[in-house]
Amino acid sequence: MCTLVLAWQVFADTPVAVAANRDEMVDRPSEPPQRIDDEPAVIAPRDSEAGGTWIGHNEHGLFVGITNRWTDAELAGDRSRGLLTRDALRKESAEEAARFVESAVRDHEFDGFNLVVADENAALLLEWDGQLAVRNFQPGVHVVVNVGADGDWRIPEERPEDGRQQGENAA
């Protein structure tokens, strides 16, 4: 289960605060957070297998984080979701990153994901299960897991027990 907790516009001096874990595949090799890009400067861990990342922050104040999304759809997933995250981190704002993701899902096949983009002005959730849904977050604390966000859970038929348990744990 991957979990991402976003506190957006909750703290006066910190418009974006995040806590996250990546524990679905604990044996997957990764490198610790480091500067992975210079234009703009991006700090993120690196997935040693596919070369992307699952979470990061850039010099413009843009945060991008992703969780896998469990779906019943058979998705081709020809491009790494971590590369999508890395590329979104090259944008200047959450709105620009969201537009980039909207374009990327038209051009490439991805496995299911929940992708959060946030800066001081906007916070959005982009949910991909073969179709893209975009949700604007309101100021507050938001919990994103493999089956959805903020109590809007979509439990896949292939993993009903895991999905229900994940929703209960995140509530």
Language-model regions, residue ranges each:
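N-terminal nucleophile
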Residues: 1-171
